[in-house]
Amino acid sequence: MKTQQREQALAIYQQHQGKITNRAIADTIGVSAKTIGIWKKQDKWKEALFSASKNEQKQRPINNDELNERQRLFCLYYVKSFNATQSAIKAGYSPDSAHVTGSRLLKNEKVAAEIRRIKKEMVNEMFIEAMDVLQVYIKIAFADITDYVTFGKKEVQAVGKSGPLFDEDDNPIMKEISFVDVKDSGLVDGTIVTEAKLGKEGIAIKLADKMKALEKLSLYFDLFPDQFKQKIENEKLKLAKQKAEKTDDSQEPIEIMIKRKERKS
């Protein structure tokens, strides 16, 4: 049943061309929005959507009265080399007249339209790939420790040398302790975790370098709205302040260390 729901969720996402919230999909098939988020990441829905769209465009038949086979080949070769003469030769036209043929083909309205269509597809593909890279930098830059661990205070029963402690009325004696718990790997975004290890001192989780990610994002300021630009600047100032307050000059990425409790002898 879970597999069917997972496939159904992807189908809904693709039907809406990705323009639907996790909550809306979750309400439709009866699972939590968090589950949808996990499926979306693990099954790479965005890539699947783009691949399906690209295959659909590739499979779109070109009417016989638009372009013949050699003209279509010329278009494909031309967008790779932008050399009309060589493209004409590779497409099967006579080498002796390839220079004239190539020039004539570029002036053909239908050929020119097909070249523009192919170029647009190529640009869209490169743009999506570039935005995917930027999205990774965004995730690194604004990573929150609470995405990976939960921490706070909780009450537990006090324990003495002889075991759990109780009061005169046989009620458990409680005490407040601090805790840090690592979230399950299936519930977190592992793409920005560079290292996770279990050593003698406890669990260590190292996240990718936030400052480097912010510097990369700064190179693409013109792609972002003003509000997001301010968010980037605020995060850089915050990191700079944290660095200044440290006693050392460490440039290491964020590392979360959860130490083991030492047993008393």
UniProtKB/Swiss-Prot annotation:
Q: Which GO terms describe its biological process?
A: chromosome organization
Q: Which InterPro entries match?
A: SPP1-like_terminase, Terminase_Gp1_N_sf, Terminase_ssu, XtmA-like_N
UniProt key word Transcription: no
Query: Region labeled Disordered — which residues?
Result: 241-265
Superkingdom of this entry's organism?
Bacteria
Q: Cross-referenced Gene3D superfamilies, in alphabetical order?
A: Terminase, small subunit, N-terminal DNA-binding domain, HTH motif (1.10.10.1400)
Which UniProt keywords are given for this protein, alphabetically ordered? Answer: Viral genome packaging, Viral release from host cell
Describe its function: Functions as a terminase.
Q: Which family does it belong to?
A: To B.subtilis YqaS and B.subtilis phage SPP1 terminase small subunit.
Assembly information from the UniProt record: Dimer of a small and a large subunit.
**Name of the protein in question:** PBSX phage terminase small subunit
